[in-house]
Protein backbone atom coordinates (compact mmCIF):
# COMPACT_ATOMS: atom_id res chain seq x y z
CA UNK A 1 0.00 0.00 0.00
CA UNK A 2 1.03 3.61 -0.56
CA UNK A 3 1.41 5.86 2.47
CA UNK A 4 -0.81 8.92 1.77
CA UNK A 5 1.97 11.04 3.31
CA UNK A 6 4.00 10.34 0.14
CA UNK A 7 1.49 12.24 -1.99
CA UNK A 8 2.87 15.69 -2.87
CA UNK A 9 0.80 18.72 -1.92
CA UNK A 10 0.77 20.04 -5.50
CA UNK A 11 -0.78 16.79 -6.75
CA UNK A 12 -3.33 16.72 -3.94
CA UNK A 13 -4.31 20.31 -4.74
CA UNK A 14 -5.26 19.18 -8.26
CA UNK A 15 -7.25 16.18 -6.97
CA UNK A 16 -9.04 18.39 -4.45
CA UNK A 17 -9.95 21.03 -7.05
CA UNK A 18 -11.44 18.42 -9.39
CA UNK A 19 -13.32 16.64 -6.63
CA UNK A 20 -14.66 19.90 -5.19
CA UNK A 21 -16.32 20.42 -8.59
CA UNK A 22 -17.95 16.99 -8.40
CA UNK A 23 -15.52 15.02 -10.56
CA UNK A 24 -13.62 11.79 -9.88
CA UNK A 25 -9.82 11.97 -10.06
CA UNK A 26 -6.85 9.70 -9.40
CA UNK A 27 -3.07 9.76 -9.42
CA UNK A 28 -2.00 7.48 -12.26
CA UNK A 29 1.00 5.94 -14.00
CA UNK A 30 4.63 6.45 -13.04
CA UNK A 31 4.04 8.20 -9.72
CA UNK A 32 1.89 5.29 -8.51
CA UNK A 33 4.46 2.73 -9.69
CA UNK A 34 7.33 4.47 -7.93
CA UNK A 35 5.37 5.24 -4.76
CA UNK A 36 4.55 1.52 -4.42
CA UNK A 37 8.30 0.93 -4.55
CA UNK A 38 8.75 3.54 -1.81
CA UNK A 39 10.49 5.94 -4.20
CA UNK A 40 7.83 8.37 -5.44
CA UNK A 41 8.74 10.51 -8.44
CA UNK A 42 8.28 14.27 -8.66
CA UNK A 43 6.14 13.99 -11.78
CA UNK A 44 2.48 13.54 -10.97
CA UNK A 45 -0.13 12.63 -13.57
CA UNK A 46 -3.83 12.81 -12.76
CA UNK A 47 -6.70 11.25 -14.66
CA UNK A 48 -10.31 12.24 -14.24
CA UNK A 49 -13.81 11.60 -15.56
CA UNK A 50 -14.14 15.34 -16.28
CA UNK A 51 -13.91 16.49 -19.92
CA UNK A 52 -10.84 18.74 -20.28
CA UNK A 53 -12.93 21.91 -20.49
CA UNK A 54 -14.51 21.06 -17.14
CA UNK A 55 -11.13 20.15 -15.65
CA UNK A 56 -9.81 23.53 -16.72
CA UNK A 57 -12.84 25.32 -15.28
CA UNK A 58 -12.55 23.51 -11.93
CA UNK A 59 -8.80 24.12 -11.65
CA UNK A 60 -9.02 27.80 -12.59
CA UNK A 61 -11.85 28.23 -10.07
CA UNK A 62 -9.46 26.86 -7.43
CA UNK A 63 -6.87 29.48 -8.39
CA UNK A 64 -4.65 27.04 -10.31
CA UNK A 65 -2.91 28.06 -13.55
CA UNK A 66 -3.82 25.83 -16.50
CA UNK A 67 -2.20 25.37 -19.92
CA UNK A 68 -4.06 23.64 -22.76
CA UNK A 69 -1.26 21.24 -23.70
CA UNK A 70 -2.99 18.32 -25.43
CA UNK A 71 -6.70 18.93 -25.56
CA UNK A 72 -7.22 16.64 -28.60
CA UNK A 73 -6.22 13.80 -26.29
CA UNK A 74 -8.05 15.30 -23.31
CA UNK A 75 -4.97 16.72 -21.57
CA UNK A 76 -4.39 20.02 -19.80
CA UNK A 77 -1.45 20.87 -17.56
CA UNK A 78 -2.05 22.41 -14.16
CA UNK A 79 0.81 24.32 -12.53
CA UNK A 80 0.90 24.30 -8.72
CA UNK A 81 3.88 25.64 -6.74
CA UNK A 82 5.75 25.78 -10.04
CA UNK A 83 5.19 22.04 -10.59
CA UNK A 84 3.36 20.83 -13.72
CA UNK A 85 0.64 18.21 -13.19
CA UNK A 86 -0.83 16.63 -16.33
CA UNK A 87 -4.59 16.16 -16.07
CA UNK A 88 -6.13 13.82 -18.66
CA UNK A 89 -9.71 12.71 -19.19
CA UNK A 90 -10.24 8.93 -19.02
CA UNK A 91 -10.06 7.67 -22.58
CA UNK A 92 -9.75 4.65 -24.81
CA UNK A 93 -7.59 4.85 -27.91
CA UNK A 94 -8.72 4.15 -31.48
CA UNK A 95 -6.54 2.59 -34.19
CA UNK A 96 -2.87 3.58 -34.43
CA UNK A 97 -2.30 3.69 -38.19
CA UNK A 98 1.02 5.56 -37.77
CA UNK A 99 2.22 3.22 -34.96
CA UNK A 100 2.76 6.24 -32.77
CA UNK A 101 -0.42 8.02 -31.78
CA UNK A 102 -4.06 6.92 -31.86
CA UNK A 103 -6.00 8.27 -34.86
CA UNK A 104 -8.84 9.07 -32.50
CA UNK A 105 -9.64 8.84 -28.82
CA UNK A 106 -12.96 8.20 -27.11
CA UNK A 107 -13.50 9.73 -23.70
CA UNK A 108 -14.96 7.35 -21.10
CA UNK A 109 -16.12 7.55 -17.49
CA UNK A 110 -14.45 4.46 -15.96
CA UNK A 111 -10.84 4.68 -14.83
CA UNK A 112 -10.38 0.95 -15.51
CA UNK A 113 -11.03 1.48 -19.21
CA UNK A 114 -8.36 4.18 -19.21
CA UNK A 115 -5.84 1.91 -17.48
CA UNK A 116 -6.43 -0.79 -20.13
CA UNK A 117 -4.93 1.41 -22.88
CA UNK A 118 -1.59 1.76 -21.07
CA UNK A 119 1.64 -0.01 -21.98
CA UNK A 120 2.82 -2.16 -19.05
CA UNK A 121 1.06 -3.47 -15.94
CA UNK A 122 3.35 -1.54 -13.59
CA UNK A 123 2.23 1.69 -15.32
CA UNK A 124 -1.47 0.76 -15.41
CA UNK A 125 -2.45 1.53 -11.82
CA UNK A 126 -4.39 4.41 -10.29
CA UNK A 127 -4.30 5.58 -6.67
CA UNK A 128 -6.29 7.90 -4.45
CA UNK A 129 -5.42 8.89 -0.87
CA UNK A 130 -8.83 7.76 0.42
CA UNK A 131 -9.98 5.16 -2.12
CA UNK A 132 -6.63 3.40 -2.39
CA UNK A 133 -5.28 1.46 -5.37
CA UNK A 134 -7.04 0.44 -8.60
CA UNK A 135 -4.94 -2.29 -10.19
CA UNK A 136 -6.91 -4.36 -12.74
CA UNK A 137 -3.81 -5.98 -14.30
CA UNK A 138 -1.89 -6.86 -11.11
CA UNK A 139 0.82 -4.27 -11.65
CA UNK A 140 1.56 -4.39 -7.92
CA UNK A 141 2.16 -8.14 -8.22
CA UNK A 142 4.52 -7.58 -11.16
CA UNK A 143 6.42 -4.98 -9.12
CA UNK A 144 6.95 -7.64 -6.45
CA UNK A 145 7.90 -10.22 -9.10
CA UNK A 146 10.18 -7.59 -10.68
CA UNK A 147 8.63 -8.07 -14.12
CA UNK A 148 7.84 -5.81 -17.06
CA UNK A 149 4.66 -7.26 -18.56
CA UNK A 150 2.53 -5.76 -21.33
CA UNK A 151 -1.09 -4.92 -20.53
CA UNK A 152 -3.32 -7.41 -22.36
CA UNK A 153 -1.90 -8.87 -25.59
CA UNK A 154 1.74 -7.78 -25.87
CA UNK A 155 1.90 -7.86 -29.68
CA UNK A 156 -1.06 -5.47 -29.86
CA UNK A 157 0.58 -3.00 -27.46
CA UNK A 158 3.76 -2.96 -29.57
CA UNK A 159 1.82 -2.69 -32.83
CA UNK A 160 0.05 0.40 -31.49
CA UNK A 161 3.31 2.22 -30.73
CA UNK A 162 6.66 0.67 -31.66
CA UNK A 163 8.47 2.96 -29.21
CA UNK A 164 7.01 0.79 -26.44
CA UNK A 165 9.66 -1.80 -27.37
CA UNK A 166 12.39 0.55 -26.16
CA UNK A 167 10.27 1.72 -23.24
CA UNK A 168 10.10 -1.91 -22.07
CA UNK A 169 13.89 -2.13 -22.19
CA UNK A 170 14.31 1.25 -20.47
CA UNK A 171 11.96 0.30 -17.62
CA UNK A 172 13.67 -3.08 -17.23
CA UNK A 173 17.02 -1.26 -17.04
CA UNK A 174 15.88 1.48 -14.71
CA UNK A 175 14.04 -0.80 -12.30
CA UNK A 176 16.39 -3.77 -12.56
CA UNK A 177 13.47 -5.95 -13.69
CA UNK A 178 13.21 -8.85 -16.14
CA UNK A 179 10.82 -8.83 -19.11
CA UNK A 180 7.96 -11.33 -18.75
CA UNK A 181 8.14 -14.26 -21.19
CA UNK A 182 5.21 -13.52 -23.53
CA UNK A 183 6.16 -9.83 -23.56
CA UNK A 184 9.75 -10.78 -24.42
CA UNK A 185 8.62 -12.97 -27.34
CA UNK A 186 6.52 -10.10 -28.68
CA UNK A 187 9.48 -7.71 -28.26
CA UNK A 188 11.76 -9.84 -30.42
CA UNK A 189 9.06 -10.35 -33.03
CA UNK A 190 8.21 -6.64 -33.27
CA UNK A 191 11.82 -5.37 -33.19
CA UNK A 192 11.98 -4.58 -36.96
CA UNK A 193 9.13 -2.06 -36.58
CA UNK A 194 11.49 0.25 -34.67
CA UNK A 195 12.84 1.25 -38.08
CA UNK A 196 9.69 3.34 -38.55
CA UNK A 197 10.13 5.34 -35.33
CA UNK A 198 11.53 8.89 -35.48
CA UNK A 199 15.18 9.13 -34.43
CA UNK A 200 14.56 11.75 -31.75
CA UNK A 201 12.03 9.50 -30.02
CA UNK A 202 14.48 6.59 -30.13
CA UNK A 203 17.26 8.88 -28.87
CA UNK A 204 15.29 9.92 -25.80
CA UNK A 205 14.68 6.28 -24.79
CA UNK A 206 18.30 5.30 -25.48
CA UNK A 207 19.51 8.12 -23.23
CA UNK A 208 17.33 6.67 -20.47
CA UNK A 209 18.84 3.21 -21.06
CA UNK A 210 22.38 4.64 -20.93
CA UNK A 211 21.61 6.67 -17.79
CA UNK A 212 20.36 3.52 -16.02
CA UNK A 213 23.86 2.06 -15.88
CA UNK A 214 22.53 -1.19 -17.38
CA UNK A 215 23.15 -0.59 -21.08
CA UNK A 216 25.46 -3.62 -21.23
CA UNK A 217 22.63 -5.79 -19.88
CA UNK A 218 20.31 -4.32 -22.52
CA UNK A 219 22.77 -5.21 -25.28
CA UNK A 220 22.94 -8.80 -24.04
CA UNK A 221 19.36 -9.48 -23.00
CA UNK A 222 17.57 -7.29 -25.56
CA UNK A 223 19.97 -7.47 -28.48
CA UNK A 224 17.29 -7.65 -31.18
CA UNK A 225 15.56 -4.51 -29.93
CA UNK A 226 18.79 -2.57 -29.39
CA UNK A 227 20.13 -3.44 -32.86
CA UNK A 228 16.82 -2.52 -34.47
CA UNK A 229 16.97 0.85 -32.70
CA UNK A 230 20.64 1.51 -33.52
CA UNK A 231 21.84 -0.69 -36.41
CA UNK A 232 25.35 0.80 -36.03
CA UNK A 233 25.69 -1.13 -32.75
CA UNK A 234 26.04 -4.35 -34.74
CA UNK A 235 29.69 -3.56 -35.52
CA UNK A 236 30.43 -3.01 -31.82
CA UNK A 237 29.01 -6.28 -30.59
CA UNK A 238 30.65 -8.39 -33.28
CA UNK A 239 27.23 -9.53 -34.37
CA UNK A 240 27.00 -11.27 -37.74
CA UNK A 241 24.09 -9.56 -39.48
CA UNK A 242 23.88 -11.64 -42.64
Provide a role label for each language-model segment.
Residues 1-242:
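Catalytic cores of the polymerase beta-like nucleotidyltransferase superfamily
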Amino acid sequence: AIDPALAPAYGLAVLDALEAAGHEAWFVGGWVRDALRGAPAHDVDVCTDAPWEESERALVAAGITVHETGTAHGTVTAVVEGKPVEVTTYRVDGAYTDHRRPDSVTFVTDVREDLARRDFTVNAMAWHPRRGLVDPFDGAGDLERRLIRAVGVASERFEEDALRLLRAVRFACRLGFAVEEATQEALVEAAPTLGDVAQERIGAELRGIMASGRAAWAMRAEREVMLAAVPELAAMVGFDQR
